[in-house]
Amino acid sequence: MNFIIATRRSKLAQVQTEIIIDLLNKKHDIECEKLLIETVGDKILEVSLDKIGGKGLFVKDIEVAMLEQRADAAVHSMKDVPYEMPKGFEIIAIPKREDVRDAFISLDNIKFKDLRKGAKIGTSSRRRAAQLKLLRPDLDIVPIRGNVQTRIEKIKKENLDGIILAVAGLKRVNLEHLITDYFDTKEMVPAIGQGALGIEVMEEHPKKELFKDLDHYNSKICVLAERAFMRELDGDCHSTIGAYASIKDNIMHIIGIFERKNKIIKKEITGTKDQYEKLGIALAEHILKD
């Protein structure tokens, strides 16, 4: 049996797809090949995502490949997947999640707490920018886009003091050694789905159950809780929004942030993990009442 897996052309996207291909091969002895697609989001790099349609721009062209039966499945970073799936598509599996934290990479290995006043920090994320300003109001936030390597190179090219990237992506492309600091999830609440990969299929695909075997239940329900939070707040990359759900002894804890009326609101909630979707919705409702 031979499967074709669609993904973006970036090194990180290809590495993430190879992780899924390796899992499939070990589980079912299935041969897979990648279909590399340059998405609209990859082509337009000079404009921030919130001005050109959001993170869904990384997904739509890949879904077209499945619709045209050029691919059997797609691998996405779950933080790039809009909460509303197009009709006929589904996220069939979310394998075990990687590190969810954000990382700080500085020019000369200077710790975040030791940055000079007015230091220039590169990030294209509204979520990261807002939380950086809460931690250090003096910082100068500079918008940057591009793949992991391009952003790292921009530290020198654009005379930045540092940049913020997801730990998971750096680990997957073997660049974790460049990390100067790790942000705690309470001081820098991650993006919804950060660190998680999702396998997307057409609902009618005859072999979709083979992908389901790659699902990691606790990882999946944590991501689904975060996405329920996002859906309730109608959040996207136009929003300053973040959430992180974790499980210990069957108890789920979710921390979430959302900008409302020009104010960053941060709330937490705890409950049994079988109520994961209700917890995400309840956390959003708490924020809306603030």
Swiss-Prot record:
The pathway is: Porphyrin-containing compound metabolism; protoporphyrin-IX biosynthesis; coproporphyrinogen-III from 5-aminolevulinate: step 2/4
**Further remark:** The porphobilinogen subunits are added to the dipyrromethane group.
**Keyword set includes Cell division:** no
Q: What class of enzyme is it?
A: transferase
Record's protein name = Porphobilinogen deaminase
What Enzyme Commission number(s) does the record list for this chain?
2.5.1.61
What keyword terms does UniProt attach to this protein? Porphyrin biosynthesis, Transferase
Q: How is the cofactor bound?
A: Binds 1 dipyrromethane group covalently.
Q: Which gene encodes it?
A: hemC
Q: Which GO terms describe its cellular component?
A: cytoplasm
Pfam families on file: Porphobil_deam (PF01379), Porphobil_deamC (PF03900)
Q: Return the similarity comment.
A: Belongs to the HMBS family.
| Example GO biological process | protoporphyrinogen IX biosynthetic process
Checking NCBIfam families in the record gives: hemC
Could you tell me what this protein does? Tetrapolymerization of the monopyrrole PBG into the hydroxymethylbilane pre-uroporphyrinogen in several discrete steps.
Subunit info here reads: Monomer.
Keyword hit for Transferase: yes
